[in-house]
Amino acid sequence: KIPNSAISLSGSKVTGTLPVGSGGTGITSGFINGGITFGAATDIGGTNSTTFTGIPSTHKMIRVVWFGLTPGNQYPEWRLGDSSSFVMTGYFNHMSYTTHNSTTYVDYANNVNSFRMPGWTNVNNTWYGYQDFHRHLHTNGNTYYHQETSLWNSGFTTYGAFFIKGFVNVGTKVIDRYTVIGASGANITAGNFQVGYI
């Protein structure tokens, strides 16, 4: 080990204080001093849509935890938005999953009005997992959110994990909310959701 007394920055071009948590990069990790901040878990059963607000404008990532989401005879969809409206265009959605015999299925939707799981409308579908939305401030002036969702369906255990990936261009909106919806307009049967952010 090199003793601290042997290290000197004098004569270097480095100025100022290097925070330990940033590893000298000047970029502070969101996981320092607490990590993800979660709101209270919410029962979303008995209504068609539930909106979660209070995501700060400074967030870098949004995480949503699904526990026992049973949409009924409809598939779930979800959107991001701000206080004026939800984003209703420009979602690029790619869903894939594998069966017990290693058959892989893929569904891709280009420029639709939500992230979604089309075709999964059986009343026994019950979803567990999480999704992350990574915020990307593009050089073209728009903000994009890259989605990574990983789910398991306890109603159909012969399937492996379900992955839903994609992105949405939210333009200049400052996203502060997330909503989950039953696609047919019927009430969601059951589910417990929790939303957090870094």
Language-model regions, residue ranges each:
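Register-specific beta-strand positions within repetitive beta-rich fiber domains
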Residues: 1-33
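Surface-exposed molecular-recognition determinants
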Residues: 24, 28, 33-198
